[in-house]
Amino acid sequence: MNKSSLFKFFSCSIIGLAVLSGCSKNTKKSAKSDDPRLKEVVVYTYDSFISEWGPGLEIKDKFETATGYSLTWVDCGDGVQVLSRAVLEKDNVQADVILGLDNNISAKADAAGILESYKPADADKLIPSDVVAQLGDKWTLTPFDYSHFAMIYDTQSDVPCPASLEDLTKPVYEKKIILMDPRTSTPGLGFVAWTVAIYGDKVLDYWKALKPNILTMAPGWSSGYGLFKKGEAPLVISYTTSPASHVEYDNTDRYIAPVFEQGHTMQVEGAGLLKGAPNKEGAKAFLNFLISDEAQSVIPLTQWMNPANKNVELPECYKVAAPVPSKTLSADPEVTDKAVEEIMNLLAN
């Protein structure tokens, strides 16, 4: 074989290999893009968010129409249980997004290393900085709603309306208060944080005085608030925004959220991209959509929380039945966690 023929042989061989290599890559890319899992976004969340009256179903429809992805919600119980499941699956991640972690458990999520930082497009323009600050500046969680914790009071009950957390320890409220378990429920944990913020190292003394007045400690918000609506007790831990739902759908102002002069702790709920998510691009698309005007407009009349997107106008029922406390308190999550352990031991004995 002469040099010319030899050159042509090697040239053709190299070109052939390049073409085959290109075909191989394209085949792999095509196979990957045809993977049905990459067309689906799986989101872990809590029960009330995807209940028949929650925002989940409408957000799913809007997201699928806007993006072409399919959205699968997975009910994990209450907020703390959502985190627990994600941590258990850390080495075998099944979901793409976790939704419903709040400022009282966000540090635990960060410490567990289950979240990947992602800042949605236009987040700085849409979400107020003070709301963002509640979840930190790492953007492992994107705020989607917020409200202050409050005791919801039934004005048709035979007990007076409390004016402070201290009032709740009075004998007149014996077995009149419904709380939620702080080990499984974010409102339950939020109430503990509220007591820590006000009583500090005396918080256990407060709970000793409060103990006789607790009717039950429900596993989650849905079950606890359900008992309240059935008339089992005249007081339940919830949010300052909760009475607006009764004004809007029950046409009643029977239930109110008294504002305490001492102040209230705030809950900011967030959603985050799970590290190792099977569909990372789909997860990012979901987080981008979650803070959009279209998704956020669903929040007020289904989630009964303030939308994180400041451009979304609140309905009239919020203006008449969702008071805004003048003083926002905060508590160290580590101190709150320690208090939870001590409080649950106290209540068990």
Regions of interest found by a model, annotated:
Residues 150-157, 196, 267-282, 289-290, ...:
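A bilobed periplasmic-binding-protein/Venus flytrap-type ligand-binding module shared by bacterial periplasmic
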Residues 193-258:
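Ligand-binding pocket segment of bilobal, Venus flytrap-like solute-binding proteins
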Residues 79-115, 125-136, 225-226, 243-249:
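Pocket-flanking alpha-helical
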Residues 32-107:
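Early extracytoplasmic/lumenal segment of secretory-pathway proteins
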Residues 1-41, 349:
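Short, low-complexity disordered leader/linker segments with a strong preference
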Residues 93-98, 116-150, 166, 176-182:
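A structural signal for short loop-to-beta-strand junctions that line the ligand-binding cleft
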Residues 116-125, 140-142, 166-169, 248, ...:
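Short beta-strand->loop
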Residues 175-184, 289-313:
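Periplasmic-binding protein-like
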